């Protein structure tokens, strides 16, 4: 169980959650989280069951709800709720496949200070996506690796959607022991993500890709530069 609060250059945040790898003693992974900041509320519930029905497959499901209120600063507000269900299994040695079905309902509202492009996107959206990931993992340890590497490719494909965007993400990491006596490990990583509209229209603001905050140094969250 975790509970945290903080104040910084990006504003104040309070949050908490429960993370358990053996929930009820049944090997169930449970991850719940709630985060409240000055302009957003984010909540999620993730349940995963390794070796589901003795098949060596991991079954996972999640429920999420977010509110991003930028009416005072950028003229828009986004409210999102959704759920997903999927599985992950080892297709070949060190190669994992993780298909997922994701449904999201979104409401986008604007005010007079919003840009013309945001005003054009105002409305309600229903998105039904098929997402999948390919993971090639040769790390010697998933928690604190000292050698090997991991390659991850994720793609999000619209099945039924008000807008049609495809998102591709690639993550690569490589680990190498630099000094065994001092337990010094070197890491090199690469992150690439792109969202493209199938009909050439502007990508919806909630679908636009951003660099994850934990991969940036020297920047304020939600700012440019």
Region annotations inferred by a language model:
Residues 48-51, 170-171, 202, 206:
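Charged/polar, low-hydrophobicity segments characteristic of intrinsically disordered regions
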Residues 98, 142-144, 161-163, 198-199:
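Short helix/loop capping segments that flank catalytic or ligand/cofactor-binding pockets
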Residues 179-225:
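Extracytoplasmic gating/loop element in the C-terminal half of outer-membrane beta-barrel translocons
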Residues 81-84, 149-159, 164-198:
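Transmembrane beta-barrel strand/turn architecture of Gram-negative outer membrane proteins
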Residues 1-152, 182, 212-225:
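Gram-negative/organellar outer-membrane beta-barrel architecture
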């Amino acid at each position: 169980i975790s509970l945290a609060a903080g104040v910084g250059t990006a504003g104040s945040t309070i949050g908490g959650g429960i993370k358990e790898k053996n929930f009820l003693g049944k090997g169930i992974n449970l991850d719940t989280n709630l985060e409240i900041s000055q302009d957003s509320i984010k909540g999620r519930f993730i349940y995963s069951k390794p070796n589901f029905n003795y098949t060596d497959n991991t079954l996972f499901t999640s429920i999420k709800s977010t509110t991003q209120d930028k009416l005072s600063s950028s003229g828009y507000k986004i409210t999102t709720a959704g759920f997903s269900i999927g599985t992950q299994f080892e297709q070949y040695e060190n190669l994992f496949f993780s298909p997922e079905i994701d449904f999201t309902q979104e409401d986008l509202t604007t005010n007079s200070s919003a840009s013309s492009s945001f005003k054009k996107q105002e409305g309600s959206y229903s998105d039904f996506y098929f997402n999948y990931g390919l993971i090639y993992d040769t790390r010697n340890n998933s928690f604190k690796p000292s050698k090997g590497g991991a390659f991850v490719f994720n793609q999000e494909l619209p099945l039924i959607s008000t807008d049609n965007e495809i998102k591709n993400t690639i993550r690569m990491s490589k680990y190498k022991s630099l000094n065994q006596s001092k337990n010094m490990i070197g890491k090199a990583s690469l992150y690439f993500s792109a969202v493209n509209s199938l009909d050439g229209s502007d990508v919806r603001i909630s679908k636009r890709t951003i660099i994850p905050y934990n991969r940036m140094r020297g920047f304020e969250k939600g700012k440019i530069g």
